[in-house]
Amino acid sequence: MFSVLISLYNKEKPENLEQCLESLHQQTLNADEIVLVYDGPVSESLKAVATRWANLLPLVIVPLEKNLGLGKALNAGLERCTHNVVARMDTDDICLPERFEKQISYMESHPEVVLSGAAVIEFDEHGKERLKRLPLSNNDIHQFARMKNPFNHMCVVFRKDKVISAGSYQHHLYMEDYNLWLRIMSLGHPVANLPDVLMKVRAGSDMVNKRRGWNYIKSEVQLYRLKLALKQTGFIRGTLYFLIRTMTRLMPVKVMQFLYEKDRKG
């Protein structure tokens, strides 16, 4: 048995939420519980979508009085999840039909694994698609995590008790997930990624532009300090990675777009 954890923000488009929930309904293995957190007040049109699907899905609505941000909203929802195995999803993404069947089966057959993810296909408003794969083995994920986020957050499955023991989600602007993965791995818990493509993820043409600027650099500083504190990397290598990641946040949009495209093709 497993729960699905989703956070809904007022700026989400009703049609995106509709596709998200429809993809959950079309799974070959149905979720036992879908915890949908309203991160602050949401529009009547969004509520209408949720209400309509509540007749077909095991939805548990968790309304928050005000917008708390992704990390705190997910923590509120995590508390309401009644099953220890929890699958994450975002309201603007689409699960492929066999997602839960494959991921839950993997977690059941690998009880030692605390956190697992999968490959995703990113698509934009023009229908252009990019494949995003990540390292599969525990060792390769640890190596990759020194430089980049080793999981597609919207497509992970984890064990609730281990996430809570690692400190749950903590405030880290744009990087709540990366922060949590590092803390989980620092405790020695095995992690993995499946090679299967199990989700389609919206990645608009303005996504690269949103990943620039001083707020992102502040988050990079916080991430750098966390990696050193957890001994995820040494000082020299960690500083080099920090400088590389920070420089990309200051590059012109077209340069960032080129590097992003090259990274996906690689």
UniProtKB/Swiss-Prot annotation:
Keyword terms, alphabetized: Exopolysaccharide synthesis, Glycosyltransferase, Transferase, Virulence
EC id: 2.4.-.-
Enzyme class (EC, first level): transferase
Alphabetized GO MF terms: glycosyltransferase activity
Cited Pfam families: Glycos_transf_2 (PF00535)
Gene3D superfamilies: Spore Coat Polysaccharide Biosynthesis Protein SpsA, Chain A
InterPro entries, sorted: Glyco_trans_2-like, Glycosyltransf_2, Nucleotide-diphossugar_trans
UniProt cross-references to CDD domains, sorted A to Z: GT2_AmsE_like (cd04195)
Top-rank lineage group of the source organism: Bacteria
Statement: the UniProt record of this protein carries the keyword Cell membrane: no
Keyword Metal-binding: no
Family annotation (PANTHER family): GLYCOSYLTRANSFERASE, GLYCOSYLTRANSFERASE EPSE-RELATED
Function: Involved in the biosynthesis of amylovoran which functions as a virulence factor.
Family: Belongs to the glycosyltransferase 2 family.
Protein's name according to its UniProt entry: Amylovoran biosynthesis glycosyltransferase AmsE
Species per Swiss-Prot/TrEMBL record: Erwinia amylovora
